Amino acid sequence: IVHAPEIVDRMLVDICSNDKFQVEKSLDILQKTINKTIKLSEKFVGKPKLVVHFGGMCLKECVDCKKTEKNMYAKSIESFKKLNYDPEKIEILPENLPPKPWYLGGEWNQYGFMTEKYMIDFCKMFNLKITFDICHASLYCNFAKKDIVEYTKKIKPFISHIHISDTTGINGEGVQINEGET
């Protein structure tokens, strides 16, 4: 299992961005990571898995979050189609993301790859599974006031890999298990 970079040259990997340069740079690093992962897999048994964060974050809070999320979802589809890979040689696993991630020394607002509807639709469109981060799911469910058990039941058929840690509130990420609220 390989985890793709989230930050390159102090710029967030974000294929959902409206900034063409950022999307191009993000697609470039993801393509290089895909190619390198496939090359590394020649030394191991089985198809490699690549955990990917697609982005969809902003420093500012949006006025119309549903519209922002819908636009980022559309942009992620458009961008993902540009990646060149053979699903027989690598399993790409987008990871569900938290609502208030910390990047580059500050708290951001996440608008992509959190809601179960968009994750499921994306997975169906590209025949993908996901990396299910329990901490991220808990943070999102706390933020969106959703039941984590119901949320997880909907996502479960698409899970291929799991990240486990505890959490607190809507931005307390990566807490030691049994020291948080999950």
Model-derived segments and spans:
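Active-site acidic/histidine proton-transfer and metal-coordination neighborhood
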Residues: 13-129, 139
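Active-site beta-loop-alpha junctions enriched in small/polar residues
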Residues: 5-7, 55-57, 95-99, 134-139, ...
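Short, functional N-terminal and low-complexity linear motifs
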Residues: 1-3, 118-119, 152-159
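A short glycine/small-residue-enriched secondary-structure motif
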Residues: 3-14
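Gly/Pro-rich active-site loop or hairpin
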Residues: 14-23, 107-113, 136-182
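Hydrophobic faces of well-ordered beta-strands that scaffold small-molecule active sites
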Residues: 1-5, 48-52, 92-95, 130-133, ...
